[in-house]
From Swiss-Prot:
Higher taxonomy: Bacteria, Pseudomonadati, Spirochaetota, Spirochaetia, Leptospirales
One GO biological process term: translation
Function: Binds directly to 16S ribosomal RNA.
Record-level GO cellular component terms: cytosol; small ribosomal subunit
HAMAP family according to UniProt: Ribosomal_bS20
Descriptive protein name: Small ribosomal subunit protein bS20
Cited Pfam families: Ribosomal_S20p (PF01649)
Keywords: Ribonucleoprotein, Ribosomal protein, RNA-binding, rRNA-binding
Entry annotated with the keyword rRNA-binding: yes
Organism: Leptospira interrogans serogroup Icterohaemorrhagiae serovar Lai (strain 56601)
Protein family according to the UniProt entry: Belongs to the bacterial ribosomal protein bS20 family.
Matching Gene3D superfamilies: Ribosomal protein S20
Amino acid sequence: MANIKSSEKDIRRTKRRNAANSQNRSRLRTQAKKVLKAIKEKDQKAAMTLFIEYTSLLDKAAKTNLIHSKNADRKKSRMAKRLNSSAA
């Protein structure tokens, strides 16, 4: 355990951030699974609304540096390709 007050505060801050980050990462994975499930079930309307929510979550995650912005762009692009190929 840290002996310095600022170090103790840093540990508390890190725990808080870690909890928030893991929650947001989990939310991203869950949303991706929901979109893929809707695509698999050929439910185009639901897949589209879920995809819009997913892209929003990705953009927010990129904005807060949870994931890199290019990583978010790549995930959006690949999911859009899957969505478009299922529509055809």
